[in-house]
């Protein structure tokens, strides 16, 4: 089946696509892959800054080049990762292999590419990438909608602040300390 408004998995990508289109930059598969790349790159840079003896030879001037991998991330890059994933059957491992290819293109990074993803699990990457998408969407493109929703939720939390609920372990406190932090 070809993807269109009628064959989308949910109405969000189907009939509501016009209203949610701006969210694709933050919550699409492309965006998730990009955020995984960003997390892996920033983690590698952090390892270099510790400093680990094995990474002491990494020139700090290369950090901007590394960051440009995710800053200039393209659909072709995402497709390359999907192609790697079709062989590895592992989404995060495909990101790791993609970054190793990028290190090869940079030259002089052969001794360091085994430190991509060093000491991490796939969940470490996913559990950082997914919240990053929410954070960036709030900070960049969806402020109006987010402020509206947060304002409504804040009102609900105020109205229900004395209501107890089974399994409810957190208190929202006073108005303004509610579910969302809105600007």
PLM feature spans:
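A helix-coil-helix interface module used to build multimeric assemblies
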Residues: 1-183
């Amino acid at each position: 089946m070809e993807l269109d408004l009628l064959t989308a998995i949910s109405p969000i990508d189907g009939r509501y696509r016009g209203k949610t289109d701006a969210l694709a930059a933050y919550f699409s598969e492309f965006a998730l892959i990009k955020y995984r790349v960003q997390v892996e790159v920033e983690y590698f840079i952090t390892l270099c800054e510790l400093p680990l003896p094995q990474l002491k030879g990494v020139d700090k001037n290369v950090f901007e080049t590394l960051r440009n991998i995710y800053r200039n991330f393209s659909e072709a890059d995402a497709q390359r990762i999907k192609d790697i994933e079709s062989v590895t059957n592992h989404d995060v491992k495909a990101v790791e292999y993609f970054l190793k290819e990028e290190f090869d293109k940079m030259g002089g990074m052969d001794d360091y590419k085994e430190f991509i993803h060093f000491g991490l699990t796939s969940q470490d990457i996913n559990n950082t990438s997914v919240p990053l998408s929410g954070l960036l969407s709030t900070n960049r493109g969806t402020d109006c909608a987010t402020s509206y929703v947060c304002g409504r939720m804040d009102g609900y939390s105020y109205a229900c602040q004395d209501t107890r609920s089974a399994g409810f372990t957190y208190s929202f406190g006073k108005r303004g300390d509610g579910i969302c932090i809105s600007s």
